[in-house]
Amino acid sequence: KYYISGAGDPRCKIMITMVKTSPDADPFRQQSQILVPIDTPGVEIVGPMHVFGHDDAPHGHMHIKFTNVRVPEENILWGEGRGFEISQVRLGPGRIHHCMRSIGSAEKALDLMIERGLSREAFGKKIIDLGKNMETISRAKIEIEAMRLMVLKAAKAMDVLGNKEARIWVSMIKAMVPEKVCNIIDQAMQVHGATGISQWSPLSGMYTSQRTLRFADGPDEVHHHVIARAEVKDYQESNLRTSRARDEIATGRTRGGV
């Protein structure tokens, strides 16, 4: 397994490990989550994975090798085959939290963009007045507020409808927010010039975090598939209901002699 976050931290003593235990079961019942002490024989931390060239030591995202690792059966959480179920309980709220923090990053990037635009001059003007920088600021603010409303709606759906029914809204914000925040940070770096990718600015670190988030807790493509599949299903069911209603009307007319 690789990109195991936090496994390099010396305080990490036990891992919650997702493994396939029931390959012949229904797809969502094949996985189990098992507690594995990090010092169990056969567990090898190969080393840190790099993210955009950084290893984030000592906490990091580790590459871990399992060779004939054995633990007691009672280490299975909730019972065999419930790993996916456990993950979904955590992932829904976790994705909302990711998006909330992402909006905070977008707000910070916008502040830095405005500060740079007002404090830096070129060609005798403040750079905020050059090119389309004012429009860039406007569009960033509009997108931030749109993202905020979407995240609030997803959180409301989670509170009122529960994890399962809110999953489409959660997928929508997870597919949308990190990508849009990446764009806002990218625009802020552009306003800063080369300083925006230097050690003098937090923007490059903010960008890599947001770009990485487009893989974490499900890549964009998975969430787009979930959204589109639900939308297609709704369309098909709606058309089926309409077709049935037409048939009932037609049948009623025939029986009534109309």
Segments from the language model and where they lie:
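Alpha-helical interface subdomain recognition
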Residues: 63-68, 74, 79-82, 88-258
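A short core secondary-structure module
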Residues: 1-46
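Short, low-complexity, polar/charged sequence segments that are solvent-exposed and flexible
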Residues: 16-19, 36-38, 52-56, 83-88, ...
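Residue-level preference for beta-strand/loop junctions
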Residues: 11-13, 58, 131, 169
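Structural beta-strand/beta-sheet cores of well-ordered domains, especially the beta-sheet scaffolds
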Residues: 13-15, 31-32, 41, 60-67, ...
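Short alpha-helix boundary/capping segments
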Residues: 6-11, 26, 52-58, 91-101
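Flexible, small-/acidic-enriched active-site or ligand-binding loops
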Residues: 39-70
